[in-house]
Amino acid sequence: MKADVFDPRALREAFGAFPTAVTVITASDPAGRPVGFTANSFTSVSLDPPLLLVCVAKTARDYSTMTAAEHFAINILSEAQKDVSIKFARPLEDRFAAVDWARAPNGCPIFAQVAAWFECSMHDVIEAGDHVMMVGRVTAFKSSGLNGLGYARGGYFAPSVAAKANSSAAGGEIGAVAVLERHAALFPLGDQNLSLPRYSAAGGDPAKTLASQLERSGLSVHDWLSLLDL
């Protein structure tokens, strides 16, 4: 698609093809109350000095409070924290009530059981269209060793679960759990005894192996689901 006028929905979907981590940005308002919201446009910037960056929509709740704060924190959610992401993506009045959290050295809320957290001083706020880029200088951080939650094409996924599934299939058997729909009738994939097809996985990508075997059976295989919606 060319030109600089795009269908916003199509552009958003294209951006969404890039898998990201899921974070909750937090800070305190002038009265000391915690504020925060979910964001996935996050990246490291520099080791020396230690800088990171997060993009915030100008329509975000608490946008003014967040961008005016002297300090803010980034909570990188772990694989088990999909519910936290959903809570902080919604306009709930007291989102912090359902989360186990504490104050970082400069007072920013940090969550328990996250993959990592960073508390930052505000280094710069850069205008960028309908967003701003908040650049933070890291003043404190901690990494728990837990795996981070992933997000792509509108769905959450757990990288370690996907890796274990691929690893398990690589040395054993893989199978199809699906049905075909033809003229409003459903047909299980399998033999006449209605068992599901299974194939030996000697190595390589299990999904590609399964697709190849099914195509040999005369089936057209496309649109493989690559995300695990937990």
UniProtKB/Swiss-Prot annotation:
Gene Ontology molecular function: FMN binding; riboflavin reductase (NADPH) activity
Highest rank taxon of the organism: Bacteria
Keyword line: Oxidoreductase, Plasmid
E.C. code: 1.5.1.-
Its job: Reductase involved in the catabolism of stachydrine (L-proline betaine), a source of carbon and nitrogen. Part of a Rieske-type oxygenase system that catalyzes the demethylation of stachydrine to produce N-methyl-L-proline (monomethylproline). This subunit is probably involved in the transfer of electrons from NAD(P)H to the catalytic subunit Stc2.
Quaternary structure note: The system is probably composed of an oxygenase subunit (Stc2) and two reductase subunits (Stc3 and Stc4).
Family, similarity comment: Belongs to the non-flavoprotein flavin reductase family.
Protein name: Stachydrine N-demethylase reductase subunit Stc3
Organism: Rhizobium meliloti (strain 1021)
Gene: stc3
